[in-house]
């Protein structure tokens, strides 16, 4: 079974942010703190405002259905940038 690229991208972003928060000494690293940091980075780096609650909803959707697809291209581009690429399409070239 082929792995869902949206889930892989989301998981990669979560791992990057989780490591950053732990290195920074954040006392409580959990879904809310990770989603808040991701939302802040997407807003700062990509100019697209997204609520941390929306990201936590995506997280839950992936837990229920590993084939879930993030419906917003701007979020995908922001996650791709957070993962060190220009955007989602650039990230996808390295994923495939």
Predicted feature descriptions by range:
Residues 26-29, 41-71:
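Recognition helix of helix-turn-helix/homeodomain-like DNA-binding domains
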Residues 73-88:
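DNA major-groove recognition helix of helix-turn-helix/homeodomain DNA-binding modules
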Residues 19-26, 48, 55, 88-94:
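Intrinsically disordered regulatory regions flanking bHLH/HLH domains
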Residues 67-69, 85-96:
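Short C-terminal boundary/hinge segments that cap the last helix of small helical domains
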Residues 1-41:
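A short, Lys/Arg-rich alpha-helix, primarily the initiator
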Residues 16-23, 45, 65, 82:
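Surface-exposed polar/charged interaction patches
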